[in-house]
Amino acid sequence: MENNKEVLKKMVFFVLMKFLGLTILPKGICSTRPKPSQLQRSNLVKTFKIYIFFMRVTLVTHENVKSVDQLLSHDLIYNVSGPNYDKLKTELKNQEMATLFKDKNVDIYGVEYYHLCYLCENAERSACLYGGVTNHEGNHLEIPKKIVVKVSIDGIQSLSFDIEQIKNGNCSRISYTVRKYLTDNKQLYTNGPSKYETGYIKFIPKNKESFWFDFFPEPEFTQSKYLMIYKDNETLDSNTSQIEVYLTTK
């Protein structure tokens, strides 16, 4: 009886947190270019927490797998293993999207989190992510494609670098790759104050609206809330899309 009560408490807490997360979304994905007031300032965030998170995180990579279960109507659970998990749950923006990938052969690429990750009572080694799902069949490129990432600092294009894609990319994976490059080479995230005041990555598809992700989270940074920007499961056509990064210094 006590065990059942404890499980019920966990479920109520989990659903409440998801409700709050879905009604108070982090600033991030939007069309066109953000207004300055829409961007988070790095001095309001403990950037060393972001640095530690991105340095420790392992990029989830699983290919040709099928879902085995669901907790809620908009998520999918997979029996796949990583260094710290034996089950993986991805949350999508709605039930309709989850249905598109349910019981299908898919590839999963994304950034996992563990805090507030709940699958079921017995899932002690579990991980969660938002989005990160693409169809396995018919989505690979015959020839690997390089996407050029153009980086502007204080309004001046300062550098560019390539990301090689073997399939049409999931934007959560691309976003992680860009952040990692900028952290390693331009000190985007450090274990102290960031030298950048604001920053965002902009995706420019050929036949639909542009969208962007803020590099800095809101002051009340938590992994699960911040990574929710990826729940729309946006993908990018590697042959026709562009990527731009905009940074401002203090």
Swiss-Prot record:
One of its GO terms (cellular component) is extracellular region. Pfam families: Stap_Strp_tox_C (PF02876), Stap_Strp_toxin (PF01123). Disulfide bonds join 117-128. Residues 1-30 form the signal peptide. Keywords: Disulfide bond, Signal, Toxin, Virulence. GO terms for molecular function: toxin activity. The keyword Disulfide bond applies. Causative agent of the symptoms associated with scarlet fever, have been associated with streptococcal toxic shock-like disease and may play a role in the early events of rheumatic fever. Binds to major histocompatibility complex class II beta chain. Belongs to the staphylococcal/streptococcal toxin family. This is Exotoxin type A. It comes from Streptococcus pyogenes. The lineage of its organism: Bacteria, Bacillati, Bacillota, Bacilli, Lactobacillales.
